[in-house]
Swiss-Prot record:
InterPro entries per the UniProt record, alphabetical: Arg_deiminase
Lineage start: Bacteria, Pseudomonadati, Pseudomonadota, Gammaproteobacteria, Enterobacterales
This protein's name: Arginine deiminase
Chain's gene name: arcA
Pathway: Amino-acid degradation; L-arginine degradation via ADI pathway; carbamoyl phosphate from L-arginine: step 1/2
UniProt xrefs under HAMAP family: Arg_deiminase
Similarity-based family: Belongs to the arginine deiminase family.
Length: 406
């Protein structure tokens, strides 16, 4: 058990969870990638090499890197965790009671690293023993999925997010990602590094249907000084924002939550695809998110367990008030209109801050990286020709577990 605390977006990053590309991305095809929320298929080998460079860049900066597959494998060593995961991932109502029982029994005898591989990478009918016979098997093709792959586990930022002294285990918006949450619930409940830990679970760790109250970590920025910024995107709803805000206020972990409405389209999938915090007074932004007509509210406790909502004139004003600074500095996406749109699509604004003024980002975004450099921001470049095709940058691919405040 270790102490976990994330006090900001820009304080010294000390520990982070990543997920190296694996079997789940090998299951992506042109016919299923849209359903699995990818625009294209990736070269998994090259993506893995790029991810190794990313992870090693963090290690070279003295940051602890934990890999999701390792954490899940170690969690499966706990009998209760394995039983719970098999029950949640292999449903009687989806597979039928006899076939589901046979599959659970077969998976339970599997080496834990191999089982973890399937819990993220999926399982086809062609991979099960011929001795498992059932009408369900007889009516499916060998390439049909018993468990669908979870290629979006690559983006560890979204499934859970640590906020001050606690974590939100997020109810995901799209069916293709909802099973990811169970893997994280098991890790945070049973893995020795987290089990019995002195941290709060704000939201998402109950066996209920969260309906429209969805929330994803790419929309949550812990900007520090008692404030949290949340984007209401195509994935995170006002309902999800309210539940998280109430929990933060109940546990006295935040004084205000700033909620900003984002355009509902693919390029603005999450707040961090268009905006990240990179220094005390500095944000990287795609200009569309800071237009004067973008709606923004500040939520504070109303003293009766509810929320007080204040409409803000602009997002920039709300940030200046929350951070106690006179003027926020904005570094916009680089290049002309065409280059800026291309670089935003390739995650130029989705950088991971390691400490104030030092970020990791894709080397391909030359125009925006040049603007960072001129503004005194150090960019540690990583390749992203394959990783970037998943529509996520260094921030998307990382879940901070420990980070200093400001």
């Amino acid at each position: 058990m270790e102490k976990h605390f994330v006090g900001s977006e820009i304080g010294q990053l000390r520990s982070v969870m990543l997920h190296r590309p694996n079997l789940s991305l090998k299951r992506l095809t042109p016919s299923n990638c849209q359903e699995l929320l990818f625009d294209d298929v990736l070269s998994v080998e090259r993506a893995g090499e790029e991810h190794d460079i990313f992870a090693n860049t963090l290690r070279q900066q003295g940051i602890e890197v934990l890999l999701l597959t390792d954490l899940l494998t170690q969690t499966l060593d706990v009998a209760d965790a394995k039983a719970w995961l098999l029950d949640t991932q292999i449903s009687d109502y989806r597979l039928g009671p006899t076939f589901a029982a046979d599959i659970r029994a077969w998976l339970a005898d599997m080496p834990h690293r191999e089982l973890a591989r399937h819990l993220s990478g999926g399982l086809t009918y062609g991979e099960i023993p011929a001795s498992i016979k059932n009408m369900v098997v007889d009516t499916h093709d060998i390439n049909d999925f018993i468990m669908k792959p979870l290629p979006n586990h690559l983006f560890t930022r979204d499934t859970s997010c640590w906020i001050y002294n606690g974590v939100s285990i997020n109810p995901m918006a799209k069916p293709a990602r909802q099973r990811e949450t169970n893997n994280l619930r098991a890790i945070y409940r049973w893995h020795p590094q987290f089990a019995g830990g002195d941290f709060i679970k704000y939201f998402g760790d109950e066996d209920i249907n969260y309906d429209h109250a969805t929330l994803e970590g790419g929309d949550v920025l812990v900007i520090g000084r008692g404030a949290v910024l949340i984007g209401m995107s195509e994935r995170t709803t006002p309902q999800g924002v309210e539940f998280l805000a109430q929990a933060l206020f109940k546990h006295r972990q935040a004084e205000r939550v700033i909620a900003v409405e984002l355009p509902k389209h693919r390029s603005c999938m999450h707040l961090d695809t268009v905006m990240t915090h990179i220094d005390i007074d500095t944000f990287s932004v795609y200009p569309e998110v800071v237009r004067p007509d973008v709606q923004c509210w500040t939520l504070t406790p109303d003293g009766r367990g509810g929320l007080k909502r204040t409409q803000e004139s602009t997002l920039v004003h709300a940030l200046e008030t929350a951070l106690g600074i006179d003027q926020v500095r904005l570094i916009t996406t680089g290049g002309d209109a065409f280059e800026a749109e291309r670089e935003q699509w390739n995650d130029a604004n989705n950088v991971l801050t390691l400490r104030p003024g030092v970020v990791v980002g894709y080397e391909r975004n030359i125009w925006t990286n040049e603007k960072y450099d001129k503004a005194g921001i150090t960019v540690l470049p990583i390749p992203g020709d394959e990783l970037g095709r998943g529509r996520g940058g260094a921030r998307c691919m990382s879940c901070p577990l420990e980070r200093d405040g400001i």
